[in-house]
Amino acid sequence: MFSGIALSGIKVFISYHYQCDNKVAKEITNIVNKDRTSLFTVLQEQVKINDSESIKRWVDEEIKKTRFTILLISKETFEREYVSYEITRSRENGNTIIPILIDNEENAFSEEDIETLSKKLPKTNCKRIRRWIKDCGKENVLQWLNDALGV
């Protein structure tokens, strides 16, 4: 699934597995939208799109407007067709990818798991993997966005 964040004309695309990662995606949306000192604004899908070609067309249009992609990673993330498509399109667009591991109880990742996941990420324009819980994502997601922007 997807969501976008705009920063003074600079947008960020959020790629995630809807069933597994939607809660954290909503948390990021709420954190960003409620922070009055932040320049970020979350843009959300306005209409539910169900057919594959329409989803891909929407993804293509949205990613063309962005410079950054937040990739929320849970156990099943890389098994999802649209997540892979969004990563590919983000790379083709030259986006910086900010991977965030959703390290909750349902997603107990070992260091070996994380190393394997790292190998699935692009080698260029990809920031280090952050952990949503261990790295206090709720408190730090805005800083991670600023860091990626170079602020």
Q: Could you describe each region identified by the protein language model?
A:
Residues 68-71:
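Inter-motif core of Ras-like GTPase G domains
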Residues 105-122:
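Glycine-rich, charge-decorated loop segments at or immediately adjacent to ligand/cofactor-binding or catalytic sites
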Residues 1-65, 141-151:
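Conserved N-terminal substructure of TIR/SEFIR domains
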Residues 97-101:
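Conserved beta-strand/loop subsegment of P-loop NTPase cores
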Residues 21-24, 79-81, 105-110:
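Short catalytic/ligand-binding loop motif for oxyanion handling, primarily in non-cytosolic enzymes
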Residues 17, 74, 102:
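Cofactor-binding loop segments of dinucleotide-utilizing enzymes, especially the Rossmann-like FAD-
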Residues 123-151:
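C-terminal helix of von Willebrand factor
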Residues 76-95, 107:
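Conserved TIR/SEFIR loop-to-helix hotspot centered on a Trp-containing motif
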